[in-house]
A protein has these predicted regions:
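Surface-exposed, charged secondary-structure patches
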Residues: 58, 71-118
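Bacterial N-terminal signal peptides
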Residues: 7-17
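Sec-dependent signal peptide recognition
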Residues: 2-9, 131
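Short, low-complexity N-terminal intrinsically disordered segments enriched in polar/charged residues
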Residues: 17-51, 159-162
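Hydrophobic pocket/interface hotspot
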Residues: 37, 49, 57, 109, ...
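Short, solvent-exposed secondary-structure junction/capping segments
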Residues: 35-39, 53-67
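A mature extracytoplasmic/lumenal domain signature
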Residues: 53, 63-64, 111-113, 127, ...
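Short beta-strand edge/turn micro-motifs at domain boundaries
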Residues: 108, 124-151
């Protein structure tokens, strides 16, 4: 009786631990895709950005106007690539405390972020990326974010490195 119980517990543990391992591998792959997005912006690498975005995506940023109404900026795929890889200013975006939800071949990445331009703090907000798994890798199907300039929390990542 004890032997059967031990074997049953071991089988159950293996089933749950392998599912947990798969979920963790998916989480890491999603985080890697988001980090590639940030790297593409920082290095102005349009090719890298194109390799992780789904063509035809619609992307939206939201910032608050003086009257308290939201200002929504919509960018299609081509405009997003052009705007985010335009040469000129050094930019750095960092996210932390991410929440990742995965169901089958779709996922959501949600995290607070800060954004720096030419080494100086510019704004903060929340990033929301919707991703799909192509069978080979996770791709961003939509990027939406808030853009806030006031009441930004201190990043737990510390100061940016130059």
């Amino acid at each position: 009786m004890t032997y059967i119980r031990v074997v049953s517990i071991a089988i159950i543990w293996l089933l749950f631990s392998s599912t947990g391992l798969a979920d963790e591998q998916q989480r890491r792959a999603i985080i890697e895709t988001v980090n590639q997005f940030f790297l593409a912006i920082e290095t102005k690498d349009a090719e890298l950005l194109e390799s992780i975005l789904i063509p035809g995506s619609l992307n939206i940023s939201s910032s608050e106007q003086l009257e308290g109404k939201p200002e929504l900026t919509k960018m299609d795929y081509e405009r997003m690539i052009s705007a985010l890889t335009r040469p000129g200013r050094d930019t750095k975006e960092r996210a932390w405390d991410e929440t990742i939800l995965i169901q089958g071949h779709i996922a959501i990445f949600w995290a607070p972020y800060d954004f720096h331009v030419d080494g100086k703090f510019s704004h903060c907000g929340v990033d929301s990326f919707q991703l799909v798994n192509s069978g080979e890798k996770w791709l961003i199907s939509n990027a939406s974010w808030t853009r806030e300039t006031q009441d930004c929390p201190q990043s737990p990542l510390g100061p940016i490195s130059q």
